[in-house]
Amino acid sequence: MTKEPGIAIIGLGLMGASLAMALRKRGYAGRLAAYARKAETRQEALARGIVDAAHDDPDAAAGEATLVVLCAPIRASVELAADIAPALRPGTVVTDVGSTKGWLCRQMAGILPPGVFVGSHPIAGSEKQGLQAASADLYEGALTVVAAAPAAADAAAARVDALWTAAGSRTCRMAPEDHDRVLARTSHLPHVAAAALAKAIGRDGAAQVGAFCGTGFYDSTRVASGSIEMWNDILATNAPAVAEELRAFKMEVEQVYDDLQAGRFGEVARFLERAREAREELLKGRGRKDGAR
């Protein structure tokens, strides 16, 4: 359990509210302060006992805490860090929940004192958004990557580890650039592929075609319903790595296209077989059975 006497959650959407709920459910006894832009979000968070204090000013929330968690889209997190920097107490650690780390760590180095920021990325979420979609179990058993820049002290990273462990997550350490290369393949490429698939299927007469869409369509395009602001930030701040993964994906699609055009159906069958084997290996690596979410 984290020993932080006070934690500030800057942003009470899906990720931030779920973090507060997870900490409370698992016995965190310290003070939880939060910032949210909308008055109705602040009121609901207080009424449900999700946080102890809900502010309309991020400085006020951050000033109460020894650990601050930025739960906003990546570029908005940079702006929020600049806002709260003057209010931070000595010894306060700042972390985040964003899906890219290299660009963010570089930006934070110009805003916060050395050793204050430790990036983190809980590999959990939903295409749903907002406080209403939050769950105390969102982080349960999920992997959170703690991606500290070289200037970050190990003690600060350990405090971020403890935060996510207290929320029910497993943690691992990675360099920010290594994190971005891996997540470009496992998260960012799948999102672009889902978006492209939804766009291609709905290109003409979407209303008429929709009646014929089954579970395969919904399963393979679900994430395309996610936050546009969040995903635009992710792709913009990890563009080279995502582009490299798209190149590999494009080669696979083009090969199947060529084989279909040429009538090489044996090659198509081998492609499908290799794809199934690859998926099974990926699921083993994550420790999940087929069909598990």
PLM feature spans:
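Rossmann-like NAD(P)(H) cofactor-binding subdomain of soluble oxidoreductases
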Residues: 80-134
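Internal alpha-helical scaffold of NAD(P)-dependent oxidoreductase catalytic cores
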Residues: 137-222
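Interdomain hinge/lid region at the active-site interface
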Residues: 207-275
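Glycine-rich, N-terminal phosphate-binding loop of Rossmann-like dinucleotide-binding domains
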Residues: 71-73, 98, 148
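Residues at the starts of beta-strands that form the adenosine-phosphate
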Residues: 6, 31, 116, 143, ...
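NAD(P)+-binding Rossmann beta1-loop-alpha1 motif at the extreme N-terminus of oxidoreductases
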Residues: 1-63, 67
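Rossmann-like NAD(P)-binding element
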Residues: 58-88, 92-93
